[in-house]
Amino acid sequence: MNIKKYKNYLFLLPFIFLFLILLNWHHSIGLSIDDLFFYTIPQETNIMSFVIERYDIWSSRILIEYILYHILQSPLILWWYLDSLIFTFIAILTYKLINGENNLFYSILSCILCLSFIFSSHYALGSAGFVTTTINYTWPLFSGLLALYILKNHTAKDINKTKNICIYNFSTLSYVCSK
């Protein structure tokens, strides 16, 4: 009976391995190009002046660049963990949107899909700096997938309605503010 209980959670193993692979990969990434631009902002101006200036240039990116500013002022290890979690959650949400059951095959497939996206677009992700690019494009992708997942669950069952609506609105706002 106990073995069957653990067998139900076997589908989670690929996601744990994915997180560890991503964390190891992030360890080799440093700051470059746009990352350095956002990193040096505190030496040049204060955050409010920067936000006002960026609003005039590209108003829809204020929220994401505000987050980017604070992430880059923190130790890089914070971004390693957050970005690895975001990519892992993208794989989990892809899995959940495709298949709601605890199926090992689909969890492996979802992780392979996520890794193939990362490694096939490695050059594009790093072209403007990994931190900047992933926060500007991958994190909103996560928000969009989260909104789709919540919408899918919300239409399927009517539990935690207020919580789902709040998370859906936040995810949609995060996704919309990315462009």
Please place each PLM-identified region on the residue numbering.
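Extracytoplasmic loop-helix module adjacent to an early transmembrane segment
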Residues: F19-D56, L68-Y69
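Membrane-interface helix-boundary motifs at transmembrane edges
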Residues: N2-K5, Y95-Y106, H154-T162
